[in-house]
């Protein structure tokens, strides 16, 4: 990770350099053989919180716009939204990172559907961030037995989807867990290191959640089901996990992959993995998380996850053109998966910029996940808007 940039210097950098970046032009190589229904998606889960904290967004003419409408105008056709169970502590203090409780996620879902885009709902089954290194149970489920957890995840999924359906925003696709390499609802649903039977228990939880989802559907295929792993270049991980899950008959339609070249390696390795797993399991594949920095500069006091080191490792320059090239090449790799199994790409958090008070986690949130780090946004230089909310030309890669 790169050295911290002091806050005053970071602000001066953002005020000086980043508006110029919004005026840069980019050259985008056309996609080959892109299907008309190819998913050009974005995860905008932090948007409502960012707006509540004072951020506004501008188009290329510096006209204030609704960023959802601007994404749609530039070709984005599918939106991913995460959902946490109760992202607040006992005193009601929010955890940050978007504050993605049911009310927040429903409000965003209504904007998505009103704009004419499709919706992917990402169940984390936790009160805050989940990934391969952490899968904390919701506070309300902390003392439940395994059998009780199966009931809880079934009922929660059923009731949540029923609410979305009632509000007229039934998702088009649902993700059962987020980056579940290590399983979910630890320790009962952990996929390793629990003395045996790990995948039996994990499959039981997944099946319970899927059954809850399907209670709201007119047919099993009405809403696509995705299972999602991180580290999209690691074929051995995907084979290990999905071999075990398919042995146990867990029903799903799509394999989701996270892909950050600066952590995971080149797109060519992702492509090889997608080619293999799409045929091995006879499933569609979607890159459901991906992002790249348009600058190594920083806009706040939190060290960014993308800096000079990541730019050197990521395979593309840390420029607006480099960002656009990354997204274009990633989409092409998915399109090129054999037998038309590659269905799309979701860009992660293109609208996550840095209004005052914005943070990946508050102190309350850090306490919940037991991860204490500097307050602030570590991702703003991978957005598709600069830190003043001006859209970057790289957004045109979705057209």
Feature annotation, model-predicted:
Residues 50-51, 55-62, 87-90, 95-103, ...:
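Acidic-and-aromatic substrate-binding clefts and catalytic sites of carbohydrate-active enzymes
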Residues 26, 30, 272, 276-279, ...:
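Aromatic-rich peripheral "rim/lid" segments of glycoside hydrolase catalytic domains that contact
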Residues 61, 65-68, 200, 214-225, ...:
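Glycoside hydrolase catalytic-domain groove-lining segments
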Residues 42, 71, 122, 174, ...:
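Conserved, mostly hydrophobic/aromatic
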Residues 22-76:
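N-terminal carbohydrate-binding accessory modules
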Residues 44-47, 84-86, 124-128, 176-181, ...:
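Active-site beta-loop-alpha junctions enriched in small/polar residues
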Residues 8-16:
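Bacterial N-terminal signal peptides
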